[in-house]
Amino acid sequence: MKKYFYYAISALLMATSVITTSCSNDDDSLNEIRSDKPTITHWVEPYHVKDATVEDAKAYMSDAMNRYALSGETSNSSSIQLCYTTGVNDEGVLYSFTKHTGSLYSIIDTELVVNGDIIFKYLNDKYDEVPGAYKNEARLQYTFTNQDKSMVITTVRVSDVCFNIDYSFISK
């Protein structure tokens, strides 16, 4: 149990650095996305299969989410991370894998607020909102789970233009 706690803490620390750098206040990109019009017509979820490998995620991204490009692959003593970006508007996906087993344990997807209606409709249609979980519409803060409750999806606004969707797996 302690091992999973340390992985969770590591994921949160890594997410903090991604949050603070993924949605910068670059004036040019802010002007591009200040419109109220969505930049997508439908949303594709990032790869989120528990215990998947780095190669599984790379294959999915190159096939299903090919508007994203691999912008970084890092490794340290406890984890491997893949960072994908679109190259515009601070959108990106961060995958985290355990170094020991090479299995996927966390996904953070940074999306544009203007696409929120499309994304939240998808999440509401596919997942169950967790009853009693803290909810804040202004901050786009929601919590969802899949049918077998093996995954928790949380969302939160991280800037005026971006919000994060965090996929975390639950061990039973």
Regions found by a protein language model. Name each.
Residues 1, 23-24:
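Terminal processing/anchoring signals of secreted or surface-associated proteins
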Residues 1-9:
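Bacterial N-terminal signal peptides that target proteins for export
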Residues 18-22:
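C-terminal motif of bacterial Sec signal peptides marking the signal peptidase cleavage site
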Residues 24-121, 125, 129:
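Short helix/turn-capping signatures at newly exposed starts of structured segments
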Residues 16, 79-85, 139-146:
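Short, solvent-exposed polar/charged micro-motifs at secondary-structure junctions
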Residues 105-172:
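Extracytoplasmic electrostatic interaction patches
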Residues 9-17:
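Bacterial N-terminal signal peptides
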Residues 3-4, 32, 147:
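N-terminal cationic leader/targeting segments used for protein routing and processing
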